[in-house]
């Protein structure tokens, strides 16, 4: 019979074994940060974009890891656990959106950003593509990135702090500072190369975790019969069309529209060594995404049977993965699985920090110092980039210090904000010669405004009619497309160089 002292001793030993795995994981990230510092931080393009020298496999997994964040490991399983298989519509929409993104956006963006003044940020590309001499478009799009990504980043820090709090019973603020320190370290010193390599490493960890947990859970339950048990508990658990209205399904599916305008994802396409490597990246990236998301769905479904079988009181569905990893695995393996959650969180934070830093440096500081200074004072601009990483992180930490801050309610809508304001603009910029600066600015701003208005005033009316509960990216995207097209048609046409560049981009992309 175990005494209280013996049980406590075993718990402490288990925690220390888990801590060892987390410490090893952190150490690897620090080493990668040093490697990135030595290899590719000599100029701003190297620091912010890896010198456009990234291979297809790192591109694929870094895009996936920075995209999924802690949502794939905690949010999606929790949603499936709560609502059943109908929550899978978001995975279908995201996978389809990412797949189309590789075909429609990736090749042209890689070629066009280099052709258009070797742009290293999305606002810089918009400026060069539309000959925005007044920098209005660059400043507005840069501000959108800085504001929304600072909020996005703070949500990642909150997730990191809460992970240490819920998994180990440690102080929330200690976990917050620890996660922030590691991410800031390798991003500050190693730049884009370090972020991409760590994302690759973290993507591998995430994939292993999402395959391992549901398989072991089924082995400890009823094998493949676990899904029969889940259906027996509630028939709608395994029905893709039950539990959600048509509006709900369309809303989840429409998340895929956001991919074309997410700066931290499409910057991966800009950094790949050649557009000819993108098919390899696409095959690996979409395979990784499909397996990872299916694994997350499987975690949620097996969790429906797992929780009552092990007599667990699950207060927060989003902690399902944490609970399963602690109950089913040895503490060392459990530490690895908790590292997978950290990997998901930190890969997104680092990508968002770097994109925000690059916008502050390239889109704002360069305006103050001038183009010539940027060419002749590369070391200065790299240092400004590093300091921008630090500054954004400090602001995000300050916001995250109070995890109950109402700003948290806004962060979940950032995907829609970027999707509605940037996705149509990116597509028009890559394909339509008639796009004008006025059309671009009007479309971008109108898309963002519709998202904000929909969230603030329309969605609260969902109890009157479910159409008002439609995901805000849909009306925002539609309005942005219409406004961009109409205003462009009514304003002065761009110069002949645009058609020449578009044709050149098209021809280069078609080269085998």
From Swiss-Prot:
The keyword DNA-binding does not apply. NCBIfam families: Na_Pro_sym (TIGR02121), sss (TIGR00813). Its main location: membrane. This is Sodium/proline symporter. It catalyses: L-proline(in) + Na(+)(in) = L-proline(out) + Na(+)(out). GO terms for cellular component: plasma membrane. Signal peptide: none annotated. It is a multi-pass membrane protein. It is found in: Cell membrane. It comes from Staphylococcus aureus (strain MRSA252). Keywords: Amino-acid transport, Cell membrane, Ion transport, Membrane, Sodium, Sodium transport, Symport, Transmembrane, Transmembrane helix, Transport. Belongs to the sodium:solute symporter (SSF) (TC 2.A.21) family. GO terms for biological process: proline transport. The chain crosses the membrane at residues 16-36, 54-74, 85-105, 139-159, 174-194, 200-220, 240-260, 286-306, 327-347, 381-401, 410-430, 438-458, 467-487.
């Amino acid at each position: 019979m175990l005494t209280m002292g013996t049980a406590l001793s075993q718990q402490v030993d288990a925690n220390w074994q888990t801590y060892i795995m987390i410490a090893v994981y952190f150490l690897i990230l620090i080493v990668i940060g040093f490697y990135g510092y030595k290899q590719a931080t000599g100029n701003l393009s190297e620091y912010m974009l890896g010198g456009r020298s990234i291979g297809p496999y790192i591109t694929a997994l870094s895009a996936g890891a920075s995209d999924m964040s802690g949502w794939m490991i905690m949010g999606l399983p929790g949603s499936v656990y709560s609502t059943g298989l109908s929550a899978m519509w978001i995975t279908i929409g995201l996978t389809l959106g990412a797949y189309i993104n590789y075909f429609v956006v990736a090749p042209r963006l890689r070629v066009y950003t280099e052709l258009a003044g070797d742009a290293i940020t999305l606002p810089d590309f918009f400026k060069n593509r539309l000959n925005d001499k007044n920098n209005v478009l660059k400043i507005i799009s840069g501000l959108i990135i800085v504001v929304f990504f600072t909020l996005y980043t703070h949500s990642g820090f909150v997730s990191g702090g809460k992970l240490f709090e819920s998994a180990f019973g440690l102080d929330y603020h200690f976990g917050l500072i620890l996660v922030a320190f590691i991410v800031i370290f390798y991003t500050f010193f190693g730049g884009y190369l370090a972020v991409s390599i760590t994302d690759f490493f973290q993507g591998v960890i995430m994939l292993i975790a999402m395959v391992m947990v549901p398989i072991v859970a089924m082995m400890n339950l009823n094998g493949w019969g676990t899904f029969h048990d889940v259906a027996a508990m509630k028939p709608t658990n395994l029905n893709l069309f039950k539990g959600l209205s048509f509006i709900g399904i369309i809303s989840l599916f429409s998340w895929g529209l956001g991919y074309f305008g997410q700066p931290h994802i499409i910057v991966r396409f800009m950094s790949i060594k050649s557009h000819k490597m993108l098919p390899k990246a696409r095959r690996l990236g979409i395979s990784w995404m499909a397996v990872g998301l299916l694994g997350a769905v499987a975690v949620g479904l097996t969790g429906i049977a797992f929780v009552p079988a092990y007599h667990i009181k699950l207060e927060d569905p989003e902690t399902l993965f944490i609970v399963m990893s602690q109950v089913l695995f040895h503490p060392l393996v459990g530490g690895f699985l908790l590292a997978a959650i950290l990997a998901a969180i930190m890969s997104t934070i680092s990508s968002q920090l770097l994109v925000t830093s690059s916008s502050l440096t390239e889109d704002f500081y360069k305006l103050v110092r001038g183009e010539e200074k940027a060419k002749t004072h590369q070391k200065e601009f790299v240092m400004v980039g590093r300091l921008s990483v630090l500054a954004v992180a400090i602001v995000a930490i300050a916001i995250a210090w109070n995890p109950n801050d109402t700003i948290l309610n806004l962060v979940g809508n950032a995907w829609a904000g970027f999707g509605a304001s940037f996705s149509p603009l990116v597509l028009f910029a890559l394909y339509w010669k008639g796009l004008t600066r006025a059309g671009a600015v009007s479309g971008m701003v109108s898309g963002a405004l519709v998202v904000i208005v929909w969230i603030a005033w329309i969605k609260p009316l969902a109890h009157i009619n479910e159409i008002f509960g439609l995901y805000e990216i849909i009306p925002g995207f539609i309005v942005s497309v219409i406004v961009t097209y109409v205003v462009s048609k009514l304003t002065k046409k761009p110069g002949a160089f645009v058609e020449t560049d578009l044709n050149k981009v098209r021809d280069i992309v078609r080269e085998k």
